[in-house]
């Protein structure tokens, strides 16, 4: 995939999702104090962002190892952890105006298990009205600022990794940087 294809198929959509996320700040400030705030808009964004993350990780994993069947996230995580140096430690921070929050979306990776935010996504997607035994609230409440921000950070990090490794032959062109309005520039 070349740069133009990457921009067309993935980056434009990321920027669209990021803009939708930033539009929520009219109602909810992007800061840790609001992490538990949930809404229909966060639910919509959470599902869209996680679907996009699923798509880009599928393409990345297929470039490493062709599979006759679609890989689930546990399978993808194993491939990602094996093929991306320091995968669990990849992090990004929000820009200063958003409290400079450091996010490590993959840090809780364990073999045969997905990340907390991905588990929350699946519960929101498939068991939205079920009551969580810990919180005593429906899983709908997991469509909150924290999970949306973490999922968006994972997508941003992964798009950067994908672009650097699969679209630019491992070299970063200083004339083309994947700028985010939410996150600081990705550092390898």
Stretches found by the model and what they are:
Residues 1-47:
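Charged alpha-helical initiation segments
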Residues 16, 20-27, 48, 52-55, ...:
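Amphipathic, well-ordered alpha-helical segments in soluble domains
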Residues 29, 57, 61, 65, ...:
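Hydrophobic/aromatic-lined pockets within catalytic cores
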Residues 39-64, 149-156:
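Short, hydrophobic, well-ordered secondary-structure elements
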Residues 54-119, 126-131:
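Short non-catalytic regulatory patches outside canonical folded cores
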Residues 116, 125-140, 159-167:
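Substrate-binding/catalytic groove segments of enzymes
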Residues 141-184:
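Amphipathic, Lys/Arg-enriched alpha-helical patches that create a basic surface
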């Amino acid at each position: 995939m070349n740069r133009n294809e990457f921009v067309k198929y993935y980056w434009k959509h990321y920027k669209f999702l990021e803009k939708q996320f930033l539009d929520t700040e009219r109602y909810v400030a992007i800061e840790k104090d609001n992490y538990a705030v949930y809404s229909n808009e966060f639910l919509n964004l959470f599902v869209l962002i996680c679907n996009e993350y699923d798509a880009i990780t599928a393409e990345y994993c297929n470039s490493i190892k062709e599979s006759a069947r679609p890989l689930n996230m546990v399978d993808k995580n194993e491939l990602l952890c094996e093929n991306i140096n320091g995968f669990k430690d990849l992090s990004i921070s929000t820009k200063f105006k958003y409290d400079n929050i450091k996010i490590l979306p993959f840090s809780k990776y364990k073999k045969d298990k997905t990340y907390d935010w991905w588990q929350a996504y699946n519960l929101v997607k498939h068991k939205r009205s079920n009551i969580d035994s810990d919180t005593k609230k429906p899983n709908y409440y997991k469509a909150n600022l924290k999970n949306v921000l973490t999922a968006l950070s994972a997508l941003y990090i992964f798009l950067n990794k994908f672009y650097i490794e699969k679209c630019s032959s491992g070299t970063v062109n200083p004339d083309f940087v994947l700028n985010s309005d939410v996150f600081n520039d990705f550092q390898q």
